[in-house]
Amino acid sequence: MGYDARGCVRALADNLRAPLDDSALAELQRGSELEPGVTQPARAFALCSSAALVVNVFAYWRGRDQTPLLAALGVAGPAGTRLELEAPLPTGLPGDPPTVDVALHRPDGRCVAVESKFAEWLTRRPRGQRVFKDKYFAGGARVWEAAGLPACQALAEDLQAGRERLKHLNAPQLLKHALGLAVNGLRTSALVYLYYDRPGRDSATHRAELARIVARLEAEIDLCVTTYQELFGVLSATPGLDREYVDYLKQRYFA
């Protein structure tokens, strides 16, 4: 794999296990990972790209029975074969809808929404800023409560007011996804927070924040937390998977 001094490949295909078909590429373009900067290539060209990690792990499952994948994610219930990248989850509010990294569509109409983190969680969350745009509270609106999510509403208000502070976990993003699922009639769908763990003090803090937020929301939403390391451990022991897929992931991310 050739790359430059910035750790970026010359072509997107060089960063991926297998080329993307046109439909998958169109889905990925709904996000911002393929947008180049003024002096920098698109983030998806970086060896440490979160988008490349998502594609390399999940694109294999497009059109396949996703039962082993759901099991590896710790999600129970029936699995389908349809997988969507950068799936929009409209909240009913003005502006572009939030997108979730992966949506696994089940045959009963529900979906499993996967929010993926590679190294993003290691960057500390900014302090002294309002974490939601005004539209989420415009005119005293309680959008999560109106969608049947009062615990999410309480957490959103605590985050906005600074009563709940998190160093590593992007909880507002999870709350937006929970709102999008609920507004679209998918409240019983699972929301998975999947991250690439790294040892150290930051990891312990991140885990503690996750445990605290899950405890606040678990009675209301099906929020599952797992690591890429745990996911790969299960997948690598699953019979019937293409060895090229498993070997690529092991060499690239888990050696």
What is each residue range found by the language model?
Residues 1-255:
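Charged, terminal alpha-helix-loop-beta segments
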